[in-house]
Structures are given as structure tokens and as C-alpha cells.
Amino acid sequence: MEKITLTRPDDWHLHLRDGEALKAVLPDTVRQFARAIVMPNLKPPVRTVAEAAAYHDRILAAIPPGRTFEPLMTLYLTDNTSPAEIQAAKESGFVKAVKYYPAGATTNSDLGVTDIRKCDAVFEAMQTVDLPLLLHGEVTDHRVDVFDREKVFIETYLRPLKERFPQLRIVLEHITTKDAVEFVLASDEKVAATITPQHLLFNRNSIFQGGIRPHFYCLPILKRETHREALLEAATSGNPKFFLGTDSAPHGRDRKESDCGCAGCYSALHALELYATVFEAADALDKLEGFASFYGPDFYQLPRNTEKITLTKTPWQIPDALPFPESSLVPLWAGQELSWKFAPVA
């Protein structure tokens, strides 16, 4: 197959940052995706509808001329989020979900939830108005092995949460384990998951090949090969409970290559080419459009896009670095040659 035509996809988990960084990275996302669920972990985080509206406006102002893009906003859940804020979020029309970060779990999550059980009144309100909950599904207990934190979160917090709020729509984001796949498969239609390109392409060996490879470091961290294989099977199965979410997370090279490097992989530049590489290797290119273009909007109860994009068999090399404010930005798998190339349909 030399060419694939797909309905224009959406990214259901994206970090855009703010200010000059936003202006630097947004064009990459806008080129490939029609919409994106935008993460709220700025400094300070996006905690209210008013803050989400202001951030929404800043994103719209940064869209390159001649491009169309719809940012789908989220609120950052804290111990102090109120049911009234949830009602306002639902009524806003542009806030599409609420994001749960365990305090300290990942970049800019210090103000996250200290105990998920403190948020039951908020979850009740979300269930009532049908506003989805997006989960960074890891525990932060330092006694739990970093490779086990997703599994422990599912057993300790997610199963009880689902039992307490059976009608709450939940997205377990950037899943990394066979345990997460099995939980989603065993749950009803109100539970779904996003999967990143890095967790489909690589296992934890990639972080340590010939030394420390900081540009493969993300959270949740890459896992062993058996987990990657389970994710691959889920993503390419055609099951609508699994859909595209890049978790593209830009950090300047100096923030990645340091004695305390930041977690995150930048894939917005070449996300669809990476996913196509994965699906082709699995002999499942016929399943790519559902994963990338259909299952996400269906879960979020939004219309599917009508525009088309193409991927053609055109070899090209991922750049070693991209421009970024006061630094440079190293894309995921920098220097690698890919055989698929993205193009919009004229």
C-alpha cells in the first residue's frame, strides 16, 4: 500500500504549554489534527472555567493563519474543586473534561489531588452532568516501584471509583500496561483509554540503550515488552474503547538533558506517521482510521470530522531538533527514517 486516506483525526491528550512555547508547538498539532483535548497543567494550572476560557483564547490567537483547529479544554482537578465549578464547566460548552493528577505524579502536578476520595462530591456532580473524568492513573507512594504504579492505581483507586460512580465516563489516559488494557476491556462502555505512540513503539529498554536516553523518558514510564504487546493488540483491535492520545509534551533540550530531566516525549510533529508505522508493522492499517479519527469523538459524544488527510509512502528523516524558546526541542525518535509522510487533502 502506497497511500492511505483517512478522516482528519483528533488528539485526545495533548500538552500545548503557553506563551512563546505555545506559539512554537501549536502549528505541528494544527497541521495534523482538527481538535485536541488540551491538558491543564500550566503554571499556575487551569482550575476554573474562567481560566480555561482565557487559555482557550490564547490558543485560538496562536493558530497559524489559514488553519482551522478547535481546542477542547479541561479543568485541573484539585482538593478544592467545587461541584458548582463542574456545573459551570458543563454549561460552558468548551470545557469537555476534568483532569485528575495525583499530586506530584508528573510535570506541574504539585497542586493535584492528595486523596482521590476527597473528590467524591465533584465526581458525583460530573456523573450527574455527564462530564468525563480523565485520569493520570498512577500512585505516587514512593514505596511502590515506578514500574508498578499504574497497576497499583487501578487496583487501589480506580476499581473502587468505578464502583462508587458507575455512570461516570472515565478515560484512563496514556495506558502502559496489560493490567490497564484488561481493566478497560472488562469495564462497560463508559470507560475508555488513550494510547501514545511511544508506548506502542518502545519498551523500557529504549531508555537505557547504550546509556541514559532522556528523550524516551515519559510518565507513565515505558514498560516491559509484554505490556507493549498488550497495548499494540488493543490499539490495532478495532475496539472503540481505545483511541489516539499522543500525550505530546514539549520540553526544551536543556530541561530533558539534565541531572533531573523532565518527563515527556514530543510527537506532535509526526504523530500520524508514528502511528502508521505501528499499525503497518502489525498488519492493521485498516484499523488506523477508527483509532485515530472515529472512536475518540464517539466517546466524547462529538461529531466525527469530515475533512480528509493522506499518508503516503515517502521516506523522510525525523529532524534532530526543532526550534523552541531559549532552547531546542528534540522530537521523539529523532534522526530515525520513517516510511510514511503526512499530507492534507487539497
UniProtKB/Swiss-Prot annotation:
EC number: 3.5.2.3
Cofactor note: Binds 2 Zn(2+) ions per subunit.
UniProt cross-references to InterPro entries, sorted A to Z: Amidohydro-rel, DHOdimr, Dihydroorotase_CS, Metal_Hydrolase
GO biological process, one term: 'de novo' pyrimidine nucleobase biosynthetic process
Binding site for Zn(2+) 2: K99, H136, H174
Catalytic activity, as annotated: (S)-dihydroorotate + H2O = N-carbamoyl-L-aspartate + H(+)
Keyword NADP assigned: no
Pathway(s) annotated for this protein in UniProt: Pyrimidine metabolism; UMP biosynthesis via de novo pathway; (S)-dihydroorotate from bicarbonate: step 3/3
Essential cofactor(s): Zn(2+)
Sites of N6-carboxylysine modification: K99
Active site, renumbered: D247
SUPFAM superfamilies assigned: Metallo-dependent hydrolases (SSF51556)
GO cellular component: cytosol
Keywords: Hydrolase, Metal-binding, Pyrimidine biosynthesis, Zinc
Top EC group: hydrolase
Binding positions for substrate per the UniProt entry: H15, L16, R17, N41, H136, L219, H251, A263
Gene3D superfamilies, per database record: Metal-dependent hydrolases (3.20.20.140)
CDD domains (UniProt xref): DHOase
Top-level taxonomic group: Bacteria
Entries under PANTHER family matching the protein: DIHYDROOROTASE
Quaternary structure and partners: Homodimer.
Role noted for this protein: Catalyzes the reversible cyclization of carbamoyl aspartate to dihydroorotate.
Family affiliation: Belongs to the metallo-dependent hydrolases superfamily. DHOase family. Class II DHOase subfamily.
Protein name, as recorded: Dihydroorotase
